[in-house]
Structure formats: C-alpha cells, structure tokens
C-alpha cells in the first residue's frame, strides 16, 4: 500500500490577496472559532430575503419534473455513458450518499441542504463519479430554476430512479432549501488522509495516497471485532459515507463487517430490519466500478485544475468511462436484472456459496462458486459474468440477526418491498423534522414514530385575556421565577436546527427520557411541572364549555415568558415577551425513547451544565449548542448573560451568577465579567471552575466556569459583552434577550410564518 498522505496541500497559499497568507487559525489552532455561528448568512444567499422556497416548490409542475427525470434515466450521454443504458443506479447512489451522511448524535449531515455540491463531500472518495451525476441533472435544474433546490432534486432523482425500474416508493416530500457554502459545523473526523480511521478508532488505519482502496492483504487489525467508533461519527473511515465495502480496514471478514454496519446504520437512526432492507434493496440495482487500478485515477474535484470546471477523478484507463470506469475499485453487478426491481439479491445471497477473489482494480470481493455466468455486462450484450458480492453484502448472511431478517425478506418479497420503501423514505427524510414540514403532492400523510409526531390542535386557543390571567396565576404560585425560566429553557432548548428535532412543542420535557436526563433531573423541574399541571387542569376545567384549552407545552413556555417579563420589571424595565399559543402535548406512545435519548446534551453552557473533556473545552460545547439552536454570536452572548442573572444553572449553583440581585434581568453579568477590579484564578487546575477575588483585598467575590469567563477572555465575545456591559447597555440587553428568548421558544413552530432561523434579529 502506498504511504499515507494528507488529502490537502501541505503548504499554505502564497496568494497575498483574497484572504491568503498566515491566518489566526495557523497561529492559534485551538482558539475558539465562532465562524459556525455566522454560516449561511443572507450575504451568501443570491436570493432576496423574502424568497419563499416552499411557495416556489408548490408552484412547480411536479409531475412534469418527474417526467423529465424519467426521460433522463435512459438518455445515455457519450461523455458519461449509462450502465446498462440506465442511469438509475447512479442516481440512487447519489441520493443515498447525499442523505446518508446524517447521524443521530447531533443531527448533522443528511441531504437537507444540498451539501454534496460542496467540499469536502463533493471530493470524498466514496462520492467518486457523483460529480457526473449532478452534471447530468443540470439541464433539468436549469429548466426549473428556483422552483426546485439541488437538495430536493438530488433526492427526488433517486426516488424517480427507483420508480423507473419498477419499484413503488413510499412517497416524497420537498422543502429542502439550498445553502450556498460548505457547512463548517460538522465534525467529519480528525484524520488527515483519505480512508484513514486512526483518530475515530484508537487502533485505526492510516489511510491511502490519493484515490484508492485499502489493501486487504495486510494482517487484520486485532480489534475489528471489538473496536468502538468515536462519537458523533457514523462512518468507519474518513471519506466514506458508511462502512468499507471490502470489510473493516479492507479485511474481507463479513462477521466483523456486520459489526461496523450495525454501528454505522444505527448511528444514522436505522434498526436491523431497516439496515437489511436498505442494503438488499439498494443493491438490487446497478453496479460498482473497478475496471482497473485506482492508480489510473487523478485528483478529486476540489483539487482539480480550473479547466476541469468542478469535475474530478479523471481516469487515464482506456476511455476513462463506461466499461473503463473506476470508483470504489470493486467490480460487482449484483443481479441479472440490474435495471429492474427484484429480490434476486437475496436469492443469490443464499443460493450460492462464495469465494474470495480480486477485482480488476485489486479490491477484495466475492464470487459465486460452481455456477454459470448469468450476470449481464453493462456495455457488451455478448458477455456474461459470474454473480459477485461485497464483503458487506455477505454480512447479511453470516451475521445471525441480519440473516434471520434477510431470510424472512427472501420468503416474503412483499414484506421486503414494503420495508425497503419505508426505510428508503426514512433515509431521505430523516433530517426534515416533523411531517408538518412536508410539501408536495406525493408527501405521505401517515404518522411515523421517527417523525416525532405531535397531535394536531383540536381545541380553541387561548386569547389575550386568557394569557394575561394565566400569567398572573403562574406568578402567584409562589415558585421562584427561575424555576419557570429553567423549565421553559429545558423544554425549548432541545431543538436542533440540524434535523429539526426537539423543541417545546409536544411538552416531552415531562416524558421519558427527557425528564430523567441529568440536566433535568432536578427538584425545580418536578416542582414546576406539578404546579403547571394543576394550573392547566384548573383552567381547562373552568373554560371547558367554551371549547378552549391550553396545552402543557404552551403553559411551560408561557410561564417562562411571564417570569422573564417580571424579571425585567424588577430591573426597572417594562417589556412584553411575545407568546403565541398553538403547541400540543405528545404522549409517551408517540415518543421513541431510544431515539430521543440522542438529544440529551453532553453539555449545555447556557445552564452551566457539563464539563470539559480531554479534547473539548466547555466553551466549545457552548458554541456547538448555540449552533444547534441556530443562534448567532450576539444571541448566544445575550442569552448566557440573561440566563445567568436569572439564576438558571441546572443544579442551582452560583457559578457565573455575577450579580447581587439574582432573579432580576439586569446586565450585571457583563459589567462584572468585564470588571478589572476582579482577579480570576483557576480552582481545579484550570479545567472548568474559577474563583474571582477582589484585586485589592483578595476577598472572594464570585465563582465562574469556562462558559462564563470566555465572554471576557475571547476577543470577539468580549467585544459583544462590552456592548451589553456599557452604561447605556441595559435597555438594549433586555430588548435583545427577549428577542433571542422568543426565537428559542419558537424554533420548532413550523406553523408560524417566519419561525426558527428566520426570526433571528441580532
């Protein structure tokens, strides 16, 4: 195997314009980077601020678009010919690899933003030749323009590909608005070589030079049957969507490969049945490409010359296309009908015995023993080939749990087809959030548990008079205002802008698993929920004849809003915190406990929860949480400052509560974190906790965490803190805190015009 090599240039750009030269990150690579809070700003978007993609998609002639996609499937182009005269396999792979980057731990990845167009994804080894798939789609994208995003089009093309080959899909929803730059928030791994996994596994593999396959001829790693993949990653190698098709680190071991498959597919939200359905269903079509050694393949799109116009992986082997194509290095066509739906994949998997062999490109693959050549050639109708499989295909036979499912699918083809249609739909829509976001004539109406269903509003909503009366009742309970603020934040701040999961709607804060999370399993939550449930019952009983009701989800948010208003009033400022009813309460039966467990925060710096790890400091966790909440740096700053003085630390500690009047919405946090009369010293070796003392007397004044002191230490955050800590900053602080609070409370209110990201005002 060639020496491992970094996939990017080892030398910095010598350009002395356009941002070239030595940068801050070169001097201080560990410095906190706020860049992910500034992504996808209006300045990068070519459309007007009032452009409504949902309205544009709904104006689309959807079935005309599908007709054009159907025609494209068999319109083979000389510059990139279609295997078997049909592009279906290519477009299925494109859609799969667009959506399949999703992972459950942070909701990042997935097909929701069309990120496959940008580096690094457009240049991953696993995405070789998908640059051509997108160019084949360009005439259709050009024709329909802004009415169909790339994000939607790439996935719809995969759906139409299945239909064009005789498979009945479960449905399709549009609504994925494009972004216009690479998403820099995603941790794809720490490796610096393609196919490397020496960071994500403690005893991983160093990777390969350029484009290529790992050598399976080297001794297998001792831990491929036991190793644990680093969180939040799902893929087993840098540059792969899923697992190595040759087996773990190139070792052709189907049983060990099954372990990697279960980890990877599980981390994208798929159970064993869905995993088997996706692999067996997807591999019922098309082929892989390994006509010759990967040494013939040139650099990826991001490294290719200007004259290549965004295309990469130029192939020097003969024609470099069609029968001479090289992508994975594996040369496998799974069935004798690669352009028609069948259950032949499962039939062959169990009918034949398999022996290890090599592809023309030198990759490990498996060939059927003692049988005749029945597999058609993709370009020469006079040729036939022996049936072949990937190591990861054989995992479905040799892993006991997968085998049981696969044999059931083999015996019940209708059940297999239904399972594949549902798993494929889930794959494409996992990061779209609730079904209320679905648009288009083929969007299914069935509620599915992984969509986190919430009942539709079935009662008259409270009006302004009701809201005012409920606020008074809430504040008259005698509970501390911080209880209501903490509960509302705990409920709403589960939202993730990445996959549109979580949020206050549904009131799942009262259900398992959220109620038992360490960050929530505190006395204040039980006290608050008990009080609010009584208020809800009393109100609903009193107004039952009017048809009005208030959900607990609404009441939790309203209580937080009432407490913030009262805290501002006690600080000398009158302000109304917006509140819009319309949330509903989900049931425990509508809540998939295992799935929701992935939303539990490792850290929530807004509540001073969590500690630094050996690799991640508390302030990095804070910025990551802010990104999941779609917050800007000013919004993060004002929220931390406000939540501290409102005394909302998860455990009731006084760390960072830099005020002599907790519970009042003052700008004291900022004035005190910026106070030069305070000297700070680490209390626990500089890990997380600090003590602030009077610089003259040495008397203790405050304690604070890294998530607090970063607002005085980090130059950019200090600049923001100075705005709110100035003598004229109090009024702006309250106004901005209420705006950011309102945004977080409504992040999951997809029924409101301008909800979520669009509500950002700072």
Curated annotation (Swiss-Prot):
Its cofactor is heme b. Its EC number is 1.11.1.21. Homodimer or homotetramer. It catalyses: H2O2 + AH2 = A + 2 H2O; 2 H2O2 = O2 + 2 H2O. There is a cross-link at residues 242-268 (Tryptophyl-tyrosyl-methioninium (Tyr-Met) (with W-96)). This is Catalase-peroxidase. Pfam families: peroxidase. Formation of the three residue Trp-Tyr-Met cross-link is important for the catalase, but not the peroxidase activity of the enzyme. Its main location: cytoplasm. The gene is katG. It comes from Aspergillus niger (strain ATCC MYA-4892 / CBS 513.88 / FGSC A1513). Gene3D superfamilies: 1.10.520.10, Peroxidase, domain 2. GO terms for biological process: cellular response to hydrogen peroxide; hydrogen peroxide catabolic process. Residues 1-22 are annotated as: Disordered. The active site is at 97 (proton acceptor). Bifunctional enzyme with both catalase and broad-spectrum peroxidase activity. The record marks 93 as: Transition state stabilizer.
